[in-house]
């Protein structure tokens, strides 16, 4: 039980890294962060993560009867791909992120929230095949993402772009490691 909670928390932090990195970028562009901006950011990113997790979970649940024999490979493949992509993107980002507009209306936040939640869809697919409480995972991931995005605004304002790349790399590596853990458990190499 504790291993499942820890795994869910690690996934939550990892999936939140895109929103955290984008929020740091937004924080770089403001002279001060208002509490309302932080709340809006948290709601946009956390809510979008929850929606995409639910969509991914239901999409996978519809096909779970057909893929249970190789679900561990799906989990591993998705998490390794998402994690690898996060690490790759951290090295590919340019000054464009730092110049992101600091507006917090729906026209600016919706595309960012959706872009940061694409990975959540794949994680939602993975949740359908993992031994975890899906409602708890969705709640945990969306709350952690909301908190990280709000904190990212303040961190971006205070410290600049220094933390953006390491956060994204760390999130990617953790997702890859969780994928490896799930694969090794299903293959009987390790037991948790």
Swiss-Prot record:
Q: Where in the cell is it found?
A: Cell membrane
TM stretches of this protein: 2-22, 41-61, 62-82, 109-129, 136-156, 172-192
**Record keywords, A-Z:** Cell membrane, Ion transport, Manganese, Membrane, Transmembrane, Transmembrane helix, Transport
> Principal localization?
membrane
What family is it from?
A: Belongs to the MntP (TC 9.B.29) family.
Function per UniProt: Probably functions as a manganese efflux pump.
What protein name is recorded for this chain?
Putative manganese efflux pump MntP
Taxon lineage:
Bacteria, Bacillati, Actinomycetota, Actinomycetes, Bifidobacteriales
Q: Which gene encodes it?
A: mntP
């Amino acid at each position: 039980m504790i291993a499942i909670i820890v795994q869910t928390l690690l996934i939550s932090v990892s999936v939140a890294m895109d929103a955290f990195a984008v929020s740091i970028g937004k924080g770089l562009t403001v002279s001060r962060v208002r509490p309302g901006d932080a709340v809006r950011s948290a709601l946009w990113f956390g809510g979008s993560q929850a929606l995409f997790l639910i969509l991914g979970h239901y999409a996978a649940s519809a096909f779970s009867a057909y893929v249970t024999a190789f679900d561990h490979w799906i989990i591993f493949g998705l998490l390794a791909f998402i994690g690898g992509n996060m690490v790759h993107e951290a090295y590919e980002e340019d000054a464009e992120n730092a110049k992101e507009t600091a507006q917090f209306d729906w026209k600016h936040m919706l595309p960012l929230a959706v872009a940061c939640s694409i990975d959540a869809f794949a994680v939602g697919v993975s949740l359908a095949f993992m031994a975890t409480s899906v409602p708890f995972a969705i709640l945990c991931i969306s709350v952690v993402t909301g908190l990280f995005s709000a904190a990212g605004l303040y961190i971006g304002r205070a410290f600049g772009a220094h933390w953006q790349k390491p956060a994204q790399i760390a999130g990617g590596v953790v997702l890859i490691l969780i994928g490896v853990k799930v694969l090794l458990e299903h293959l009987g190499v390790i037991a948790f």
